[in-house]
Amino acid sequence: MNPKSKIPEPMKKPILLYLTTLALTALCGRAAAGQAAAQSAPDMSKYILTPKPADTPRINGARVFGVRPGSEFLYTIAATGVRPMTFSAEGLPKGLKLDPETGRITGRVTAPGEYTVHLKAANAPGSCERNLKIVVGDEIALTPPMGWNSWNCWARDVTQEQVLSSARAMVESGLADHGWSYINIDDGWQGKRGGKHNAIQPNTKFPDMKGLVREIHDMGLRVGIYSTPWIGTYAAHIGSYSDNPDGVNEWIKKGRHNEHYRYQKEGGNYWKDRTEVWHLGPYSFVEADVKQWGEWGIDYLKYDWNPLDYYHVKEMHDALRTLDRDVVYSLSNSAPYGDAPQWMRYSNCWRTTGDIRDTWESISSIGFSQDRWLPFNRPGHWADPDMLVIGMVGWGPKLHYTQLTADEQYTHISLWSLLAAPLLIGCDMAQMDDFTRSLLTNDEVIDVNQDPLGLQAVPVWQQGDQVIYAKHLEDGSMAVGLFNRGWQTVKMNFTLRMLGLRGRQTVRDLWRQKDLTECTDKFETAVAPHGVVLVRVYPGNSGEQATGK
């Protein structure tokens, strides 16, 4: 790497005047969280709709998985049911092997192509079989990523132990059995540059990054990390660019940092002095950082700044492609819509807005404004309306239970699933209550999000505060969400004609996982304030042929 290589002339000028909504809301949120008293989760058990999994096996999660030729392969067969459980996989491509006790498929595949693998899970009460399509080619993240991110609970105070406890909780709580697989470290891990690549090294809160990644991989999970092309991140740690050719930022040299190498000006105000770190630098250390992440075994990158620009997006894309492992590339934040083709071409996910908050105003304004991204949402490329704000959140260090009502939380998860949005849990998983767990472990709802077609739902009807979204699924059925954004319970309905269907159809309640009725014309239901009814419409068994547009 050449540390003296500079960015093109148009990109040199620091962006000092561009104040983002993200930064304002994030910092205000941190202050509010710091002042709030610590809370415990209330008893929300009466609102649980998701049935408990059966003792017999059910294979869950994505039905299609993409990997690039020669990249390291890690896929854990997600399955519910009592343990012990054994797994088998027929038709694995050359280079892959299965651990029958853990269900982990590992190895490397060099031959491009599509491989249909027949999976089986068996325990004492029974067995389950399902196909998995492995696509060895140029695309990864063929379904929206599902995992956890540290920001919405720990923010800049995140530690190695908190990340590790979150990974353990993902496994021990059973979330991994439903397809959740990423453990992503957000801002706050960075120390100063060093090592053989002169790359960002972890601060003292992360004493053994390589060991941490290895331990999480040994659980069958994947690991994500965070950076920025600014010289400093939103939380004022160093970024992948510098204002000096040796990579040591001027504020580091002058000692304007705390024990974790976070920017800290003596007698100064971080918010007032933010422009000293929130800007692009002339010297790129992207290549060095990417080499380090590859050696650690990183699987996911959140690259965060505003405004996004083509040069830095493509630079990181190209660097990540030099690795012998696949790294999901997620852009943040507030991606300009006019450049959507570029975000789709060079990234796997792109944040469409600033930071989400745990309020109805935030989740509804973000969630119901995603329609324009529909032409760019597809397997391998996902518009990202931000993380899930359920459970214990707070942006560090003191957490509080989400301010969303139960109905608003059902709307949150249902809408994100219909949108084919990345699903990143933002709460402290070690404190997860039963209601929050029920929201995250409903496999029939997750199936809507992880459907192999990768289609974003479209609004098929809207009147005032009521809107109906519909989404075609791979098996020929349709997922339909009836949303009431108003303050009063209302009756809502859809006709088969509205959905482009005909014939006898079975309407199934996805949250309760039970069939409601057979429908030949119209389905009607009551929808609570700020609530949703999420159903799946299947062709009936009357002998009539149901046809979709």
Where are these regions (language model features)?
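Aromatic-lined carbohydrate-binding/catalytic grooves of carbohydrate-active enzymes
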Residues: 152, 166, 170-310
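C-terminal edge beta-strand
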Residues: 45-47, 126-137
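A short beta-strand micro-motif common to beta-rich folds, especially ectodomain repeats
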Residues: 77, 113-125
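Carbohydrate-binding surface patches
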Residues: 410, 416-419, 424-426, 462-501, ...
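Strand-loop-strand motifs at the edges of beta-sheets in extracellular beta-sandwich domains
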Residues: 94-111
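C-terminal beta-strand-rich structural cap/linker in extracellular carbohydrate-active enzymes
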Residues: 518-544
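Solvent-exposed, low-complexity, repeat-rich "mucin-like" stalks and linkers
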Residues: 40-41, 57-82
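Glycan-recognition surfaces
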Residues: 260-266, 276-277, 311, 326-428
